[in-house]
Amino acid sequence: DLTQFGNMINKMGQSVFDYIYYGCYCGWGGQGKPRDATDRCCFVHDCCYGKMGTYDTKWTSYKYEFQDGDIICGDKDPQKKELCECDRVAAICFANSRNTYNSKYFGYSSSKCTETEQC
């Protein structure tokens, strides 16, 4: 669920609040072309959720743990495990692309996100 995703982001050394309104894809919804590597993390995360179809990606909880600096998804339910993996990959992506974070994309207007990008 979104709370667990936020905890993953925080545990990887980032603040979840940095990603709520960032670029064209971080936060609710998304459109256009990702603006940088950080925004691309959100784009890939949205695509990952999109592959899950109508599954409730925002509010379904799953089992995971932090182990030796990594996130381990341990749910036996395949959909919950897939959901966890979507969140895990994004949290790691944020940590790995932190040096691309650009404050000019925080609070970025969706009206500037006009190009198209396919998953």
Swiss-Prot record:
GO terms for molecular function: calcium ion binding; calcium-dependent phospholipase A2 activity; phospholipid binding. Ca(2+) binds at Y25, G27, G29, D46. This is Acidic phospholipase A2 CM-II. PLA2 catalyzes the calcium-dependent hydrolysis of the 2-acyl groups in 3-sn-phosphoglycerides. It comes from the Eukaryota. The active site is at H45, D87. One of its GO terms (cellular component) is extracellular region. Expressed by the venom gland. SUPFAM superfamilies: Phospholipase A2, PLA2. Its EC number is 3.1.1.4. Its cofactor is Ca(2+). Belongs to the phospholipase A2 family. Group II subfamily. D49 sub-subfamily. Binds 1 Ca(2+) ion. It catalyses: a 1,2-diacyl-sn-glycero-3-phosphocholine + H2O = a 1-acyl-sn-glycero-3-phosphocholine + a fatty acid + H(+).
